């Protein structure tokens, strides 16, 4: 067994958060077990004794990796929690599937010395699933027929809404539930503007960096910190093998950009791409269990000249690949001309479209231009076609957009794409901060999330500079969890403020450990506190190093409340009386300003 296989066995799978426990809420059947993270709190200490603080239940996308009772074995993969739900519907079948070929991993022969040896250990009897002839297995199809699936009930419990509300949003196309029937390990989640704003984390190897072990660990790391979906954007060798390990161990939906792998199969020469190579790649990834595909079918031949005067041209990798193909052959984009056939594949496995914005602006100078909005019109057209097949759709958006132009993007998308979920990369609100683009983009992400975007694609500090490592992934996920939560608060999402209120109360009561534990990144919060006040006693002190004991505003506020209670006054009366006492004290001292 190779060294890299040993590395895979020894991956650093993360434990649970401090003072937290995994809790499961059971649905109408015993196999619907919806995970949450329960954060325990310490009691409030008062003069009259202790008052209990209720634990806070929060949304949890980390899968069983943070369940201390679960024994991790990534060579086995996660439990197939949806398998029985899928099979009992009776509308799918097992079949032989396609054989894995050397070109699937970017090689010309099986014995290439660069080929990964750690093929995921599937049993010899494993066969992929597909819809039976004439059947449609999409969650949208079931929703339109009035069927509430176990997946829909699972999501309803997660979101604290009714199953019927979930079904209705899916039927209308205002939400998607990405759930390939060949990814039964995934815990159902929903993407739509009437639900929690979700975030996606991009991972994937490249031709110059990263390994399978690192990408699997990055996936578990990203979901630990709160990624709701993962996109595997691998562009180097061993793409198929890397993706298999990720999907089998991913508790969240996995998306891809199939054109990247198709390009590898033709040795990186865009003009050599064909519909046949691309179609084969779609089926390959569908059989593995990819839940949504980014497909750049809106990059039409007539739109390409509209980018000629841009500052940054076409910045989407997929968009530039298709533009090059169109110009070389002077033909229409084959993803557009074969879109109906793609829909047939999507509904055979229940894969959602993520209609790619191949002409998104790559600089604020290019924001909201003719090319961007021309493509959006085509994406609206394609959305309607997909819905005719009952295929789930979300639409991708920019990009680089200054703050005053963000709302126009959201309004146009809702109108043109008939309220299909919007999935945006940021947008970045300024171009002057390489190394800090997780911040420049989070500003735009919070705004567009408030206006109605359903999912935000994270940006890490390495954006435009290099491939993110584990620390960058953590930074990007946390930054985008902040943006998504801020949007939930602004939209008035039920229950969104409960965690904020609990943390604020803990802060006012100087329950330092509860402050840390209720935060999005408990480790970082405690680390910063302990840089200046590391002693254990500082965890109960009524001040921090920012103001010190004499100038802590919250301690002073508490003193005012204590004074009011002792004097039998309310807080405003206590302040007034205190001011009067100080005035009398000033007069009795002679009324001199300086003494």
Swiss-Prot record:
It holds the Pfam family ThiC_Rad_SAM. One of its GO terms (biological process) is thiamine diphosphate biosynthetic process. Zn(2+) binds at residues 400, 464. It catalyses: 5-amino-1-(5-phospho-beta-D-ribosyl)imidazole + S-adenosyl-L-methionine = 4-amino-2-methyl-5-(phosphooxymethyl)pyrimidine + CO + 5'-deoxyadenosine + formate + L-methionine + 3 H(+). InterPro entries: ThiC (IPR037509), ThiC-associated_dom (IPR025747), ThiC/Bza_core_dom (IPR038521), ThiC/BzaA/B (IPR002817). Binds 1 [4Fe-4S] cluster per subunit. The cluster is coordinated with 3 cysteines and an exchangeable S-adenosyl-L-methionine. It comes from the Bacteria. Substrate binds at residues 202, 231, 260, 296, 316-318, 357-360, 396, 423. GO terms for cellular component: cytosol. Residues 97-120 have a biased composition (Basic and acidic residues). Catalyzes the synthesis of the hydroxymethylpyrimidine phosphate (HMP-P) moiety of thiamine from aminoimidazole ribotide (AIR) in a radical S-adenosyl-L-methionine (SAM)-dependent reaction. Belongs to the ThiC family. This is Phosphomethylpyrimidine synthase. The gene is thiC.
């Amino acid at each position: 067994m190779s060294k890299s296989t040993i590395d895979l066995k020894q991956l650093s799978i993360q434990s649970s958060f401090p003072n937290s426990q995994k809790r499961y809420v059971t649905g109408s059947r015993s196999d619907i077990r919806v995970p949450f993270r329960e954060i325990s709190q310490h009691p409030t200490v008062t003069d009259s004794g202790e008052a209990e603080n209720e634990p806070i239940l929060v949304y949890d996308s980390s899968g069983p990796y943070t369940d201390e009772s679960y024994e991790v074995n990534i060579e086995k993969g996660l439990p197939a929690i949806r398998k029985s739900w899928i099979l009992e519907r009776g509308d799918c079948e097992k079949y032989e599937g396609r054989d894995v070929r050397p070109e699937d991993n970017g090689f010309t022969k099986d014995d290439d010395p660069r080929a990964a040896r750690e093929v995921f250990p599937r049993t010899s009897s494993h066969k992929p699933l597909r819809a039976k002839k004439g059947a449609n297995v999409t969650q949208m199809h079931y929703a339109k027929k009035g069927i509430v699936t176990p997946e829909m009930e699972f999501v309803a419990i997660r979101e604290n809404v009714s199953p019927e509300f979930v079904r209705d949003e899916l039927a209308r196309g205002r939400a998607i539930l990405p759930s390939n029937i060949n990814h039964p390990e995934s815990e159902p989640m929903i993407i739509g503007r009437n639900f929690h704003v979700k975030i996606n984390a991009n991972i994937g190897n490249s031709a110059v960096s990263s390994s399978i072990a690192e990408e699997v660990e990055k996936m578990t790391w990203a979901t630990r910190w709160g990624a709701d979906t993962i996109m595997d954007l691998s562009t180097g060798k061993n793409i198929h093998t890397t993706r298999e390990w990720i999907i089998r161990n991913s508790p969240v939906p996995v998306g891809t950009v199939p054109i990247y792998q198709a390009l590898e199969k033709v040795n990186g020469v865009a003009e050599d791409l064909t519909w046949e190579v691309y179609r084969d790649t779609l089926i390959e990834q569908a059989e593995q269990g990819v839940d949504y595909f980014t497909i750049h079918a809106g990059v039409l031949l007539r739109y390409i000249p509209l980018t000629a005067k841009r500052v940054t041209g076409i910045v989407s990798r997929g968009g530039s690949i298709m533009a090059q193909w169109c110009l070389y052959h002077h033909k229409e984009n084959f993803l557009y001309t074969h879109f109906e056939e793609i829909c047939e594949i999507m509904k055979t496995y229940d894969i959602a479209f993520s209609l790619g914005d191949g002409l998104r602006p790559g600089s604020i100078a290019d924001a909201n231009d003719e090319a961007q909005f021309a493509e959006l019109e085509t994406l609206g057209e394609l959305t309607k076609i997909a819905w005719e097949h009952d295929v789930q759709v979300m639409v991708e958006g920019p990009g680089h957009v200054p703050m005053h132009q963000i709302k126009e993007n959201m309004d146009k998308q809702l109108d043109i794409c008939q309220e299909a979920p919007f999935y945006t990369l940021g947008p970045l609100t300024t171009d002057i901060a390489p190394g800090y683009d997780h911040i420049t983009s989070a500003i735009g992400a919070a705004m567009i999330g408030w206006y109605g975007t359903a999912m935000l694609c994270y940006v890490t500090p390495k954006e435009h500079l290099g491939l993110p490592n584990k620390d960058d992934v953590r930074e990007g996920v946390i930054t985008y969890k902040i943006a998504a939560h801020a949007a939930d608060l602004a939209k008035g999402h039920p229950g969104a403020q409960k965690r904020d209120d609990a943390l604020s109360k803990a802060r006012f009561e100087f329950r330092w450990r509860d402050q840390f534990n209720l935060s999005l990144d408990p480790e970082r919060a405690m680390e910063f506190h302990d840089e200046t006040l590391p002693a254990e006693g500082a965890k109960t002190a009524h001040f921090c190093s920012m103001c010190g004991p004499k100038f802590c505003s919250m301690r002073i506020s508490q003193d005012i409340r204590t004074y009011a209670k002792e004097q039998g006054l309310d807080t405003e009366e206590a302040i007034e009386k205190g001011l009067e006492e100080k005035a009398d004290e000033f007069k009795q001292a002679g009324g001199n300003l300086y003494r």
